[in-house]
Amino acid sequence: MRLLLRNYSLMEAVKRLLPRPRKKIYNLGACFELVDIPKISYNPSELSEPRFLEYSNLSDKLHLREAIDKILIPRVVGTTNHSIVREYIVQSLRDLDWDVEVNSFHDHAPIKGKLHFHNIIATLNPNAERYLVLSCHYDSKYMPGVEFLGATDSAVPCAMLLNLAQVLQEQLKPLKKSKLSLMLLFFDGEEAFEEWGPKDSIYGARHLAKKWHHEGKLDRIDMLVLLDLLGAPDPAFYSFFENTESWYMRIQSVETRLAKLQLLERYASSGVAQRDPTRYFQSQAMRSSFIEDDHIPFLRRNVPILHLIPVPFPSVWHTPDDNASVIDYATTDNLALIIRLFALEYLLAGTEAK
């Protein structure tokens, strides 16, 4: 992914219409201005308290760690390890009775030449009319002479999605026949091989968004939620897009309810974090810049996006230190729980008995 500042003159015009930022944060040379999220009357359905408590106690931490271990190897597109990880993801979901399609295509990449890419598309009901799409990328960055594992980028997000499918097997069964269902999407080729640009990055996302646009399938996506750079301690998330702000507030609400019930781990079991984590999902929105990532081809085609990526990025981003040692398992377990409950609330709240 890459940080981008928007066109200067356009942004100056937009800034004049925005509330005064409370503060600024800086990351990789780019400045993000934060504005408070306005309080709105939107109140989507919530899970009943008994259901929320019941689902909060569902977990399989051992499976999550095993999934991370399986994926946490160098997995550059075109390598044997890349195929191993792809087959692991595909088989894991097929074993859980998901319908899995591998969208294969080839493209030319700098340095590497012609490469074969494979997006993984898993659905509970391939004939559903609408989908909540949870997504991440599974390739790792090409770094000659360096063993780059990409723990946060994006072994942990991949493992979180597989763990969600594992933990929620029973709860997701109704979605095999419902009009609204769940899709797990693992993009290939997110990383650039030489220098990030329109033809050297997000290969899988660019291909799939274009394909689905021509096939008329993008209209079936309620919202695409993209997970990236997760697993390091003390992340801070923000709302990037106004049209999904109500759903950002819902995931923020899930975190708040879990914290009040003391169901979030407060200390890191990995020893990475030396203090209690602060709130993950911040009560501010970013309005003056955005991050290039797998969501961009879908955003340009008017698909609603919820981008779950921490700002600032983890300090180990695109370095050999993005390995197992950076993973804070308290944070990882907490985020996995929040995302599971958010998905259940989105998909099931309207049908649950109050």
Curated annotation (Swiss-Prot):
E.C. designation(s): 2.3.2.5
Catalytic activity field: N-terminal L-glutaminyl-[peptide] = N-terminal 5-oxo-L-prolyl-[peptide] + NH4(+)
UniProt similarity note: Belongs to the glutaminyl-peptide cyclotransferase family.
Protein name per the record: Glutaminyl-peptide cyclotransferase
Binding site for Zn(2+): 153, 191, 318
pH dependence: Optimum pH is between 7.5 and 8.
Keyword RNA-binding: no
Source organism superkingdom: Eukaryota
Disulfide bond annotation, renumbered to this chain: 136-158
Activity control note: Inhibited by imidazoles (imidazole, benzimidazole, 1-benzylimidazole, 1-methylimidazole, P150/03 and N-omega-acetylhistamine) and cysteamines (cysteamine and N-dimethylcysteamine). Inhibited by PDB50 1(3,4-dimethoxyphenyl)-3-(3-imidazol-1-ylpropyl)thiourea.
Gene Ontology cellular component list: extracellular region; mitochondrion
Enzyme class, broadest EC rank: transferase
Keywords: Acyltransferase, Disulfide bond, Metal-binding, Mitochondrion, Secreted, Transferase, Transit peptide, Zinc
A single GO molecular function term of this UniProt record: glutaminyl-peptide cyclotransferase activity
Active-site residues annotated for this sequence: 190, 228
InterPro entries, per the entry: M28_QC (IPR037457), Peptidase_M28 (IPR007484), QC/QCL (IPR040234)
Transit peptide: 1-8
Keyword Mitochondrion: yes
Function of the protein: Acts as a glutaminyl-peptide cyclotransferase. Responsible for the biosynthesis of pyroglutamyl peptides. Might be more efficient in the conversion of tri and tetrapeptides in vitro. Might have a relative preference for substrates containing hydrophobic amino acids in vitro.
